[in-house]
Amino acid sequence: MVKVANKYAKALFDVSLDTNNLETINEELTVINEAVKDKIEQLKMVDSNPTQTAEQRRELINGVFTDINPYIKNMMYVLADNRHISLIADVFKAFQSLYNGHYNQDFATIESTYELSQEELDKIVKLVTQQTKLSKVIVDTKINPDLIGGFRVKVGTTVLDGSVRNDLVQLQRKFRRVN
């Protein structure tokens, strides 16, 4: 189903670029994703209900999403017609990936053993942008006492691990190779 969601996201992304609505559509899609992310199971039930017609699913879209961008509404109609309303979170994720790629930015999760100061965060973000060659990094911070010290950054599939725990694991591996 991820491939299906990617196709919807790509179509919406292309339309948003062609019509100079990329920012608006991204913002509205973010709000929609937040609104439905806890309702995916209910949406799956709507998708799988054989007694519900496409028109009824469209009415549901109209009732819930009254004042949204017409391109998003059209995509939602297509999702409803094809019994894919529950894919909206996957569509959002794929759209976000295209959006981030367009602007050469990505999300980063910075883990540390304590709450980092703004100065420390700025230094880490600068390091991450240099290492990943991204224009912008959107940061989410988490406290992880298992790191013992230092920090670990996850950007997409890349992990930059400057934690004491990682140093100890690396040291342990070296000792095992020697013995």
From Swiss-Prot:
Disulfide bonds listed in the record: none
Pfam short name (any one): OSCP
GO-annotated molecular function: proton-transporting ATP synthase activity, rotational mechanism
Matching InterPro entries: ATP_synth_OSCP/delta_N_sf, ATPase_OSCP/d_CS, ATPase_OSCP/dsu
PROSITE patterns in alphabetical order: ATPASE_DELTA
Localization annotation: Cell membrane
Domain of life: Bacteria
Membrane topology: Peripheral membrane protein
Subunit field text: F-type ATPases have 2 components, F(1) - the catalytic core - and F(0) - the membrane proton channel. F(1) has five subunits: alpha(3), beta(3), gamma(1), delta(1), epsilon(1). F(0) has three main subunits: a(1), b(2) and c(10-14). The alpha and beta chains form an alternating ring which encloses part of the gamma chain. F(1) is attached to F(0) by a central stalk formed by the gamma and epsilon chains, while a peripheral stalk is formed by the delta and b chains.
Role this protein plays: F(1)F(0) ATP synthase produces ATP from ADP in the presence of a proton or sodium gradient. F-type ATPases consist of two structural domains, F(1) containing the extramembraneous catalytic core and F(0) containing the membrane proton channel, linked together by a central stalk and a peripheral stalk. During catalysis, ATP synthesis in the catalytic domain of F(1) is coupled via a rotary mechanism of the central stalk subunits to proton translocation. This protein is part of the stalk that links CF(0) to CF(1). It either transmits conformational changes from CF(0) to CF(1) or is implicated in proton conduction.
Family: Belongs to the ATPase delta chain family.
Protein name: ATP synthase subunit delta
Lineage start: Bacteria, Bacillati, Bacillota, Bacilli, Bacillales
